[in-house]
Amino acid sequence: MKTTRYSFFGTALLLVSIMSGCASVPMASGDEDAKAKSFTAAADKSSIYVYRNESFGGAIPMTVSLDGKLAGQTGPKTYFMWEVEPGAHEIASIAENTSTLKLNTKAGKAYYVWQEVKMGLWMPRSLLQEVDAGTGKKGVAECKRAQSNF
């Protein structure tokens, strides 16, 4: 009976350690981070921010794509910012599941997407959700900019 209890607590401790560890992802420069946090979109472009402001599931980097092209990976407290042509765009987040979000962007506007991390069966899951500018700016401010492939 005691052995079973210790095995249970040992397994639980291991799972908590894995779920709360920190993934390392390539980071953008401090200047790029500061520029993105000015939250100004170019008049002829749209800005898309994807942020992950939670530490939960931090041991697992999550792959993100924009319009079917690999953008990179997020870790805990990181974000991407992309300047894109106005129009239809699809963001995907790949973890234990694949979450997608379609945006129809307009020139001169910024869009904010929260990459929520949830408990999965074997590893964390993600859920992409568009949020309002106030919520998005606050979330991005809590994060550092990750290096993107574009």
What do the PLM-derived regions correspond to, one by one?
Residues 1-10:
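Bacterial N-terminal signal peptides that target proteins for export
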Residues 13-16:
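Alpha-helical transmembrane segments
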Residues 22-150:
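Short loop/turn and low-complexity linker motifs enriched in small/turn-promoting residues
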